[in-house]
């Protein structure tokens, strides 16, 4: 059992668990700890939550994950690419990280919205009724799911572009 757990908890899974925890922490701090969480307009909340998670990813997650864990994708170690980027590429990567966080938060918000609308229609409740409110555990789980899917899609597109360039 001990060997199974040691083999199952790979560095990628540990980093994923850390990303899950940070997303839930950001949701808790911004959603419940600031006035943005109480606004009637979800656009403000989505914006600040996306920017907040993006900044926490840049300042907290990336330095820890890429310096403590040995992250791999398709057998390739990703730590070297993170450490060897400097200057304008690093700034562009940070902006892409914030944009990716905002897009992911939008997808999570739309998931909550559509689930609530579906349940309201099924149970014949008023549209304003919120049956599944946002909370840190559910938000972090959906955030990690969508972030993983988006990052895998981006990696496949990058690989496809590299293969196309190498053929030419």
Where are these regions (language model features)?
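Loop-to-transmembrane boundary segments
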Residues: 9-20, 83-106
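Alpha-helical hydrophobic membrane-insertion segments
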Residues: 5, 49-62, 91, 95-108, ...
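Alpha-helical transmembrane segments and their membrane-interface junctions
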Residues: 29-33, 100-125
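Cytosolic juxtamembrane helix at the C-terminal end of the final transmembrane segment
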Residues: 66-75, 144-168
């Amino acid at each position: 059992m001990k060997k199974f757990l040691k083999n199952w908890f790979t560095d990628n899974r540990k980093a994923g668990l850390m990303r899950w925890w940070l997303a839930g922490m950001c949701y808790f701090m911004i959603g419940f700890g600031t006035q943005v969480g109480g606004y009637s307009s979800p656009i403000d909340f989505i914006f600040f939550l996306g920017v907040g998670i993006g900044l926490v990813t840049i300042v907290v997650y990336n330095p820890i994950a890429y310096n403590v864990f040995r992250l791999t994708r398709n057998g390739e170690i990703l730590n070297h690419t993170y450490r060897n980027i400097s200057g304008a590429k690093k700034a562009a990567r940070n902006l892409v990280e914030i944009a990716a966080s905002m897009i992911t938060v939008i997808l999570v918000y739309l998931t909550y919205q559509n689930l609530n609308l579906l349940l309201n229609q099924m149970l014949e409740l008023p549209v304003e009724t919120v049956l599944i409110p946002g909370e840190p555990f559910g938000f972090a789980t959906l955030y990690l799911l969508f972030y993983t899917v988006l990052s895998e899609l981006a990696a496949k597109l990058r690989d496809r572009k590299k293969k196309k360039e190498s053929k030419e």
